[in-house]
Amino acid sequence: METLITISRWLAKQHVVTWCVQQEGELWCANAFYLFDAQKVAFYILTEEKTRHAQMSGPQAAVAGTVNGQPKTVALIRGVQFKGEIRRLEGEESDLARQAYNRRFPVARMLSAPVWEIRLDEIKFTDNTLGFGKKMIWLRDSGTEQA
C-alpha cells in the first residue's frame, strides 16, 4: 500500500498525461490535463470524440502512457509509466467525474468534450531523487507492490 500512496501523492501534484492507443497495428499518442482519483487509481480526462485517439479508442481500449516532469538533471528525474484501459464515461458516472474535473480545472467548464477514464492496471514509478534508477511498481490485479 505504501508504494501506491507514494505514487498517488506524486500524481496528484502533476497535471498532464500522455497516453497511447493502437488500432489495427496503428499507434497514436495524445496529451491532456488530468484529474487523478487515488481511490479508483484512475485518470479523468476530456477529449473530443472526433480526435484520432478517441476514434481509435472507441468506447473502450487498451492504453499505455506516461506522466513526467521536466527536470534539468538526471538526478531529479521522476515519472510514471503505466498500462490500463481507457473508456468513455456516460450518464451519472460522467457527470460526477466532470464536476470533480471542473473543480480542479475551472476553465474546463467551457468545454463540452466527453469525459474519459483511464484505469491504471500497472504503474512503474521512477524516482531518481531516492537514488539513481529507483523504481516502485504497483499492479492492480495482484495488489503487488515492489519498491
From Swiss-Prot:
Signal peptide: none annotated. NCBIfam families: PRK03467.1. HAMAP family: UPF0306 (MF_00764). Belongs to the UPF0306 family. The lineage of its organism: Bacteria, Pseudomonadati, Pseudomonadota, Gammaproteobacteria, Enterobacterales. It comes from Shigella sonnei (strain Ss046). Gene3D superfamilies: Electron Transport, Fmn-binding Protein, Chain A. This is UPF0306 protein YhbP.
